[in-house]
């Protein structure tokens, strides 16, 4: 999103992205089953700050972001790396938090920040409860080249039995994200490249022309997680350790950036005043602010997923009605667009 870009620029990360790895999202559409109707989100002429914009958002490969983030902090004298290590124990007391690594080293500090995935070991060990949602679905991710242009338009296709997200990279290269029943995933994984590409082409009515698989296929089970609170004594959760989203809204990474932005601002202000950065009041303030960001979006997304993955006749009618109503309500579309553009 545009706010996420601003955060990454402020951290000196965005500037390190190769220009050809930053892909622009010009529009987005949502489709339901085999209906020709689509909910369309064009690029607004300006954001909420009345600044001119020409894109809904940006697509940048994960490995590019990780590499740029690593490069951006090289040379910082106040940073110490412990690469290739794993946390095997952690605890906190009135004055500090400590972690023990798998090589026996112990590290202590005023505040422990956990960013160790939605399956966070630190979250569990520190006694922070989390609500976990097993979707019973797998996600397959791969890239397809295609004959006709994608017009830099993302499409979220809620078919009956599976969901297909098409994320435009270049005009003739698209990242595909297939979500389907975990029991059916092996069938797609067993397909050769040509068969898989033809399968996707047929699903979208051949509107991209001939398609060709140009990457490996990555597969993982889909689990959503939301911690009931984002802190405990001298420990705070950020990123997926705090909230692991369903990918349908593509907001997981954006929420992760927001979490570190909120927490880091509070820490910098506290440190600037010479006060304890592990103060419970600071951590409670972080929890309140980030819960407001994540909780409505997490549960709202899960409700949308539940509706658009049910195959009953009544659900199919309701799905179509929801899209029609959304198209007819400009304020709702504006609210969704504003989440992307700021």
Outline where the language-model segments fall.
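Conserved FAD-binding catalytic core of PHBH/FMO-like flavoproteins
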Residues: 8, 98-100, 106, 112-217, ...
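A general structural signal for well-ordered alpha-helical segments in protein cores
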Residues: 1, 5, 62-66, 137, ...
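Acidic-histidine catalytic/liganding microenvironments
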Residues: 11, 76-77, 329
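Conserved N-terminal helical subregion
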Residues: 20-125, 133-138
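C-terminal helical "tail/cap" subdomain of flavin- and related membrane-associated enzymes
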Residues: 265-342
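FAD/FMN-dependent oxidoreductases across multiple families
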Residues: 186-270, 276-278
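Pyridoxal 5′-phosphate
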Residues: 92-96, 150, 256
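Glycine-rich FAD cofactor-binding loop and adjacent beta-loop-alpha segment at the N-terminus
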Residues: 1-25
């Amino acid at each position: 999103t545009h706010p996420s870009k601003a955060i990454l620029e402020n951290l000196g990360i965005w500037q390190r992205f190769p220009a050809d790895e930053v892909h622009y999202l010009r529009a987005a559409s949502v489709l339901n089953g085999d209906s020709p109707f689509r909910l369309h989100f064009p690029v607004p002429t300006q954001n909420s700050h009345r600044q001119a914009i020409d894109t809904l958002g940006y697509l940048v490969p994960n490995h590019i972001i990780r590499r740029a983030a690593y490069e951006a902090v090289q040379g910082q004298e106040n940073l110490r790396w412990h690469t290739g290590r794993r946390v095997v124990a952690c605890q906190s007391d009135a004055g500090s938090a400590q972690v023990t690594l798998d090589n026996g080293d112990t590290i202590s500090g005023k505040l422990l920040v956990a960013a160790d995935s939605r399956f966070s070991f630190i979250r569990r060990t520190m006694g922070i409860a989390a609500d976990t949602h097993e979707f019973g679905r797998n996600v397959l991710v791969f890239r397809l080249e295609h004959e006709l242009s994608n017009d830099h338009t993302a499409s979220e296709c809620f078919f009956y039995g599976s969901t297909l997200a098409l994320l435009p990279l270049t005009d003739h290269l698209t990242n595909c994200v297939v979500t389907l029943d975990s029991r059916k995933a092996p069938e797609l994984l067993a397909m050769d490249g040509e068969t898989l590409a033809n399968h996707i082409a047929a699903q979208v009515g051949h509107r991209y022309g001939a398609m060709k698989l140009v990457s490996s296929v990555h597969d993982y089970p889909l689990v959503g997680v939301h911690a009931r609170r984002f802190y405990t004594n001298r420990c705070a959760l950020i990123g997926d350790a705090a909230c692991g989203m369903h990918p349908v809204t593509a907001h997981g990474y954006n929420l992760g950036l927001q979490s570190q932005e909120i927490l880091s601002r509070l820490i910098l202000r506290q440190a600037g005043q010479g006060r304890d950065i592990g103060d419970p009041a600071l951590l409670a303030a972080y929890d309140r602010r980030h819960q407001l960001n994540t909780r409505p979006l997490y549960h709202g997304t899960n409700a949308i997923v539940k509706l658009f993955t049910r195959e009953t006749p009544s659900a199919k009618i309701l799905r179509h009605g929801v899209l029609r109503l959304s198209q007819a309500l400009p304020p709702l579309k504006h609210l969704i667009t504003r989440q992307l553009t700021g």
